[in-house]
Amino acid sequence: MKNEMLALILAGGQGTRLAKLTQSIAKPAVQFGGRYRIIDFALSNCANSGIHNVGVVTQYQPLALNNHIGNGSSWGLDGIDSGVSILQPYSASEGNRWFEGTSHAIYQNIDYIDSVNPEYVLILSGDHIYKMDYDDMLQSHKDNNASLTVAVLDVPLKEASRFGIMNTDANNRIVEFEEKPAQPKSTKASMGIYIFDWQRLRNMLVAAEKSKVGMSDFGKNVIPNYLELGESVYAYEFSGYWKDVGTIESLWEANMEYISPENALDSRNRQWKIYSRNLISPPNFLGANAHVEDSLVVDGCFVDGTVKHSILSTGAQVREGAEVLDSVIMSGAIIGQGAKIKRAIIGEGAIISDGVEIDGTDEVQVVGYNEVVGVATDED
């Protein structure tokens, strides 16, 4: 039976710009917003868009990501006609090969894709924060009779040189693609979200592999090749909130925007929920000295200090006399007595010892997973 569309989430990136936060886990597994991991947004968008089959392509440090996704039940992807598959590099008769790029990762999983037998494939990045109805994008793809549709976001002209830019005609057909141009001709930036007719893409990838023609990356190789061949390639304009959280600064900004009064992500919209693995935790405890304002405090936290405009993830502790301002404290992290944290991201399980000060006024500071800053006490 042919399935209409299969989603493939590219989640194998190392995320070196996130420094200590990705030394032991893949970037899509990094926590966000107190309760979620970054990949939850792509998975939830799939679930909310009615996509029942999802492949998650992993490579770098996949254990935490695999454990988080499990059988996909948190996103309703564990039914008879639905499922989530973890796709990792494997040894074949011709030898071992790591994924060499985004499109090469798809080529390496052709057998899996063929087993699902989709008419279309939706290619997603697992490390962006946004809400999007992929079904609406698919309808646009069909209406345009496109071979490829690229989701684009209008960005300020001064920032356009950081992105792959799509130049389009009056009907939004893409006539030129420029990778990070010094003098951009438009402000339509690729979001790294693509819908392909599967058989067309399959044929191209197989032919490129046989002829040893480099076709490892969608932005650098596949899109330019489609345009060169005269394929119908269209832009799908997206106007909602979207954030690439590939740096410490952007991850911190996205978390702060998440708790802002405006909340552009519209996280409280019950019609488009973001789902995640539900870990059962005890209620929060606020001690006699606790002072919390303008903050998001998730289940299982212990607070006996001051928390302002910050996020405390599951099981975080802020002990007596400690102050946390404009910061993200990830799960299980401990902020010791009298410690002061400002504009920082404290990784899962980290310990900030009593009296330690971390000031990110000039540059957002980061403490890695299970890292100890200062001298830990027996209580920690």
UniProtKB/Swiss-Prot annotation:
CDD domains for the chain: ADP_Glucose_PP (cd02508), LbH_G1P_AT_C (cd04651)
Stretch forming the signal peptide: none
Top-level taxon of the source organism: Bacteria
InterPro entries linked: ADP-Glc_PPase (IPR011831), ADP_Glu_pyroP_CS (IPR005836), GlgC_bac (IPR023049), GlmU/GlgC-like_hexapep (IPR056818), NTP_transferase_dom (IPR005835), Nucleotide-diphossugar_trans (IPR029044), Trimer_LpxA-like_sf (IPR011004)
Pathway(s) of this molecule: Glycan biosynthesis; glycogen biosynthesis
Keywords recorded for this protein, A-Z: ATP-binding, Carbohydrate metabolism, Glycogen biosynthesis, Glycogen metabolism, Nucleotide-binding, Nucleotidyltransferase, Transferase
UniProt catalytic activity: alpha-D-glucose 1-phosphate + ATP + H(+) = ADP-alpha-D-glucose + diphosphate
Recorded GO MF terms: ATP binding; glucose-1-phosphate adenylyltransferase activity
GO biological process, one term: glycogen biosynthetic process
The enzyme's E.C. designation: 2.7.7.27
SUPFAM superfamilies recorded: Nucleotide-diphospho-sugar transferases, Trimeric LpxA-like enzymes
One Pfam assignment: Hexapep_GlmU
UniProt KW Transferase keyword: yes
Binding of alpha-D-glucose 1-phosphate, residues: G164, E179, K180, S190
EC top class named in words: transferase
Record Gene3D superfamilies: Hexapeptide repeat proteins, Spore Coat Polysaccharide Biosynthesis Protein SpsA, Chain A
Oligomeric and partner information: Homotetramer.
Family to which this protein belongs: Belongs to the bacterial/plant glucose-1-phosphate adenylyltransferase family.
Function (record text): Involved in the biosynthesis of ADP-glucose, a building block required for the elongation reactions to produce glycogen. Catalyzes the reaction between ATP and alpha-D-glucose 1-phosphate (G1P) to produce pyrophosphate and ADP-Glc.
HAMAP family: GlgC
Annotated NCBIfam families: glgC, PRK05293.1
Protein name: Glucose-1-phosphate adenylyltransferase
Species of the source: Streptococcus pneumoniae (strain CGSP14)
Gene name as annotated: glgC
